[in-house]
């Protein structure tokens, strides 16, 4: 693989100096000729991301784009060869036929040249021709793919090659391959959530669960990649959210939308954040972003988001909110009060309805088990505990600038409290 990369890089590296040599006119100043080549190079480099990245990727697939580029390149090569030396060079019939044949081969074999490319990149050494994505959606915001699962579980979703959830909406253990019980925590945290904001959509399972709670009258969803809406159409468990009149969708960046809508306030903000170590995730878990979200919460409002097991994120949240509670890898934060009464949590959970039937079926042991676990989980405030962990493990306060969430927090080897000088002083 490395040899092939080296060879390709070597061949690409030859292009510019060869152009500078052959395209320099002998009857004019060399500097002028070379400057034109540089200008064309800069123009093409700037136009490439704009035309391909922002336009073509939005209207067609990667393999089609590669075919378009190949055809344009070959036509450009033919034209350049023809006009070189004022058209004095005459191509033989055999050369013309060979060139046309190559173009036709590339044109009709293009769909096979990149067949299974995304699967090869994803599975790497484990790739086989049997491993295929069940859905692939490409646009300028990224690549969304899904894989089918065994055992009756919901399909897995991958955004940019990383796990991004599943389509499961049922909390029972034999179906719950995405820990969707975390979404059912919403009314066990806030006593009366009426208006909800979801930052991120993915496969729609979380928004679908929120829509099953009848007391929620309004749901605003911010999703930067419109491809997820197309994907949701294909899955009946979640596609009812596309026709739910309570739900409004905004294709935008979460932070930008919040800044542009300072008057919007919600009872509940939900954010199923991606892995804390991924590129740019710092912008969704920093103290500045949490402060921005706090401005969009009503009195006693709750923000509930995925810390993905990062110890730095709960600690950062304690510097913005008075109360911080943990459920699995999620944290709930508020300046008000979280529900502490199990009876209230149970009453609210019983309101979840799907297809005119309660979500939690007490005649089903697994459904009853999921219900009981949600009811009995305490919403204990861990703020003081987080401060203790900070002192012990040197947790980081995540800011927009320090990228602390994207790097592992190491355990502090040296502790001043355990220094030899202090020990012998006693």
Describe every region a protein language model picked out.
Residues 98, 367-368, 382, 390-391, ...:
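Short amphipathic alpha-helical segments that mediate assembly, nucleic-acid/protein binding
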Residues 1-347, 396-426:
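Alpha-helical transmembrane segments of multi-pass membrane proteins
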């Amino acid at each position: 693989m490395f040899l092939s990369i080296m060879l390709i890089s070597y061949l690409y590296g030859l292009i510019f100096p060869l152009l500078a040599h052959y395209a320099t006119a002998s009857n004019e100043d060399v500097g002028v000729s070379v400057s034109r080549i540089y200008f064309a190079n800069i123009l093409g480099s700037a136009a490439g991301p704009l035309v391909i990245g922002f336009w073509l990727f939005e209207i067609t697939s990667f393999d089609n784009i590669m075919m378009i580029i190949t055809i344009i390149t070959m036509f450009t090569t033919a034209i350049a060869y023809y006009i070189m030396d004022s058209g004095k060079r005459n191509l033989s019939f055999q050369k013309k036929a060979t060139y046309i044949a190559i173009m036709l081969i590339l044109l009709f074999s293009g769909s096979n040249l990149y067949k299974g490319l995304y699967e090869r990149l994803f599975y790497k050494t484990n790739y086989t021709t049997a491993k295929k994505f069940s859905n692939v959606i490409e646009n300028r915001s990224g690549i969304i793919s899904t894989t089918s699962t065994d055992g009756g579980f919901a399909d897995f979703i991958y955004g940019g090659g990383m796990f991004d959830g599943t389509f499961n909406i049922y909390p029972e253990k034999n179906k719950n391959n995405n820990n969707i019980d975390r979404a059912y925590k919403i009314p066990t945290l806030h006593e009366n959530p009426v208006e909800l904001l979801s930052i991120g959509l993915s496969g729609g399972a979380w928004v679908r669960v929120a829509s099953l709670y009848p007391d929620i009258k309004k749901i605003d969803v911010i999703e930067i990649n419109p491809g997820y809406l197309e994907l949701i159409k294909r899955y009946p468990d979640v596609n009812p959210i596309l026709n739910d009149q309570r739900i409004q969708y905004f294709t935008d960046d979460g932070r930008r939308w919040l800044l542009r809508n300072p008057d919007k306030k919600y009872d509940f903000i939900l954010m199923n954040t991606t892995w804390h170590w991924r590129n740019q995730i710092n912008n969704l878990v920093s103290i500045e972003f949490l402060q921005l979200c706090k401005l969009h919460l009503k009195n006693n409002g709750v923000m509930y988001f995925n810390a993905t097991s990062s110890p730095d994120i709960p600690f950062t949240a304690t510097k913005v909110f008075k109360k911080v509670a943990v459920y699995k890898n999620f944290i709930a934060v508020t300046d008000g009060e979280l529900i502490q009464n199990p009876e209230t949590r149970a009453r609210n959970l019983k309101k979840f309805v799907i297809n005119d039937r309660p979500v939690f079926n007490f005649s089903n042991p697994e459904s009853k088990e999921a219900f009981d676990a949600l009811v009995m989980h305490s919403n204990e405030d861990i703020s003081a505990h987080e401060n203790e962990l900070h002192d012990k493990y040197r947790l980081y306060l995540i800011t927009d600038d320090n990228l602390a969430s994207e790097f592992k927090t190491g355990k502090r080897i040296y502790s001043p409290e355990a220094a030899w000088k202090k020990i012998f002083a006693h």
